[in-house]
Amino acid sequence: LTTPGTAIGSSRYALSEEDYARMPEIFAKWKIKYVLPTGGNGTMDTCGKIRRACEGTDIRVVGIPKTIDNDIAVTDHTPGYGSSARYLAETVAEIGADVKSLPIHVCIVEAMGRNAGWITAASALAREKKGDAPHLIYLPERPFREEEFLEDVKRLYEELGGVVVVASEGLKKENGEPIVPPIFRSGRSVYYGDVGAYLAELVIRKLGIKARSEKPGICGRASIPLQSAVDREEAVLAGRTALESALAGQTGVMVSFVREASEDGSYRMHPGTVPIEEVMMYERKVPESYINERGNDVTEEFVSWCKPLADVHHREFIDFQEYYWERKGKRE
């Protein structure tokens, strides 16, 4: 549980129809009876196709969701997301403290997540009080409007001096095209352009304000010290549930997490299974109710949903200027 990535290896090999047709024979040869594909949307699509190929056999196929992007359908959330959310939130909190100490520029933090803004949105958990970073959050679920972005940055810069913006790597224009052309496309894989650098350059050229960009990238899915304890426990639970389901005779399903309502507002969840056909290649986006009206932040509804998953550890940052003005106000 302290190894980043996966100890068993991973693959992006695109399986052909011939590959699927051979699978029952290969499984029989190696006496494989239980197949538990673990991954995101593409993996769940593969899971469904393997199940179809093995129809009529005693081979059981059960999908285990695992993606930091949190974009798999018919589950409250996915293993991996809580840890990536915690990493980004705590990293943005540290960046915010740094920018606040020398408030002379705009810092753009680019977050992973492709077409879904779940990771980007989690940066809101960095805040403890009004004025804390991030000051602006932009998700791919809303069209990116350059003029509004520049207006927001200018207003906050004049008010605060230092501004922290978190933007998704998948930001799109009104016409649905990426704001920065992808470097490369191959099947489902898209190698995004440098959105953070593009936005920083935009601020410099259009507003004449110093700006820089930061790109944590895969650090958020590889950081064991910032792994969410809730996420770790639920990842183990997902694997255990998948195996138990397969041993019980289930096939063609994926493990899902169902959040339970509680009178005291505490977080409760139980695992279940859903038909794999309901999940295959469906991309789950951040709902409208989680995004504010202007499209430059998230709502409290999202924060309440995300907080128990990320298990963010807020550290105390000292600000002597705030301390001075607080003491001065008390004396007066």
Task: Describe these PLM feature segments.
Residues T6-S11, L136-P140, Q227:
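Short, basic, glycine/proline-bearing loop/turn elements
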Residues R12-Y13, G40-N41, I64-N70, E141-P143, ...:
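Short, ordered loop/turn segments at secondary-structure junctions
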Residues M44-D45, N70-D71, N115-G117, K173-N175, ...:
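Flexible loop/turn segments at secondary-structure boundaries
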Residues P178-E332:
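C-terminal non-catalytic interaction/assembly regions of soluble proteins
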